[in-house]
């Protein structure tokens, strides 16, 4: 049996048709969902690019004890285990931070595209004019360059290859599958789409513009938490740009789904589609991940698993699951022994319908920023570390997280606060011992 993991960046669950009504067109993800087990309550244990991937390749939590950082020498990447088990391993990535974060470990082939979104344009190449774009006041210079880098890199890809980057990557992956279709393989496809900056080509760029007549500012990379710059129509425009980027990603990855079918790999391949996190687009007074607010629009993630004959089509698992569960699931399916130290659990019994006890609580957060806990009956407690006071929501009746119940339910809030910090205890002990040993 083969394993393919497709990780898309910045996919909001509420924008995907398989999860509920939306104006956004995602027919290919929806088609995959109709053949899969859909996990309705999957969360990123830390909704940020590299920490989320660290959780998904090591099976360990990051929000408790480590910031955004590269894999350490002692971290075991799941690809290393598949390689040791005799699998052919490969990864294709246009996510700009992966190569510098040691995400190539265990892969016999690691193809990283040098002209992806937000990657520095090669020296000696003049950046294209981007004066048509609006950047909010106070925009960091480093991030200000992300858009001209992205715009110029896309032009380089088109000039050198005649293709958009998602198209190029999907075609490269399809070619790799053609070459290795007779072998047992573990393949990781890591796409930065539909992450900002939004320099989406037509027909997707204007597909969702309000009334198709927006004449306001072009905002390819908005910024929060200060939203004082927002003018009427701006946020509808920002949503439209994001929606177009998601539909573009859906289009190209639909081609990859087709290739898997055409190469007759479908019946013998576990296909996992997961997003690393979502994105705030003004719902709680902020845009993008600044401060890592762990509201649903950021922390709730897409997770689908397909294996015909073993995973029932159109099935759903309603229990709480985390991206930290992904590697244990893959190892379980492949019959590879789980190493000590993994902190998730296999979701295979949930995917197959055999039955998996529902987790009573799920923990998530962002190291040194905030932490939270979601309960099986739908409550969500957020410890903001004193920044703006704690929050408590009843998600079944308040999915948008607008009615803070912290004053109405102090006993429940206190209980969840204690549970959250009890969950942190092993790491607090570990870190304090490390500090003590370092001072000797």
What are these regions (language model features)?
Residues 1-440:
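Catalytic domains that recognize anionic headgroups
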């Amino acid at each position: 049996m083969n394993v393919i993991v497709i990780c898309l960046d910045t996919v909001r669950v509420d924008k995907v048709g398989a999860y509920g009504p939306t104006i956004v067109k995602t027919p290919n993800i929806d088609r995959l969902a109709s053949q899969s087990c859909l996990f309705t309550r999957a969360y990123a244990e830390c909704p940020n690019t590299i920490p989320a991937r660290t959780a998904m390749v090591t099976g360990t939590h990051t929000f408790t004890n480590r910031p955004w950082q590269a894999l350490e020498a002692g971290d075991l990447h799941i690809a290393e285990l598949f390689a040791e088990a005799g699998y052919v391993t490969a990864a294709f990535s246009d996510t700009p931070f992966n190569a510098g974060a040691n995400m190539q470990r265990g892969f016999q082939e690691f193809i990283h595209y040098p002209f992806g979104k937000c990657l520095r344009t090669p020296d000696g190449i003049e950046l294209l004019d981007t004066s048509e774009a609006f950047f909010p006041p106070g925009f960091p210079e480093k991030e200000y360059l992300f858009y001209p880098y992205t715009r110029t890199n896309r032009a380089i890809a088109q000039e050198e290859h005649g293709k958009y980057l998602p198209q190029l990557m999907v075609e490269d992956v399809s070619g790799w599958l053609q070459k290795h279709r007779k072998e047992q393989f573990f393949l990781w496809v890591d796409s930065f789409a539909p992450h900002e900056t939004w320099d989406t080509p037509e027909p997707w760029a204007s597909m969702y513009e309000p009334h198709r007549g927006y004449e306001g500012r072009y905002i390819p990379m908005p910024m929060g938490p200060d939203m004082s710059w927002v003018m009427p129509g701006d946020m509808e425009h920002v949503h439209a740009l994001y929606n177009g980027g998601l539909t573009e990603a859906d289009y190209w990855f639909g081609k990859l789904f087709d290739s898997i079918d055409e190469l007759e790999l479908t019946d013998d391949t576990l296909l996992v589609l997961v997003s690393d996190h979502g994105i705030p687009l003004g719902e709680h007074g902020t845009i993008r991940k600044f401060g890592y607010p762990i509201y649903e629009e950021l922390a709730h993630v897409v997770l689908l698993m397909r294996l015909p004959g073993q995973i029932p089509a159109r099935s759903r698992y309603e229990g709480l699951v985390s991206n930290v569960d992904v590697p244990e699931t893959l190892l379980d399916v492949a019959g590879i022994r789980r190493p000590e130290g993994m902190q998730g659990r296999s979701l295979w019994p949930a995917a197959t319908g055999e039955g998996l006890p529902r987790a009573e609580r799920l923990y998530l957060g962002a190291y040194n920023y905030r932490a939270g806990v979601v309960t099986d009956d739908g409550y969500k407690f957020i410890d903001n570390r004193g920044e703006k006071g704690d929050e408590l929501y009843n998600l079944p009746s308040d999915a948008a997280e607008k009615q803070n119940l912290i004053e109405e339910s102090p006993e429940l809030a206190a209980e969840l606060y204690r549970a959250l910090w009890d969950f942190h205890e092993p790491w607090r002990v570990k870190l304090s011992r490390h500090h003590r040993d370092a001072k000797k």
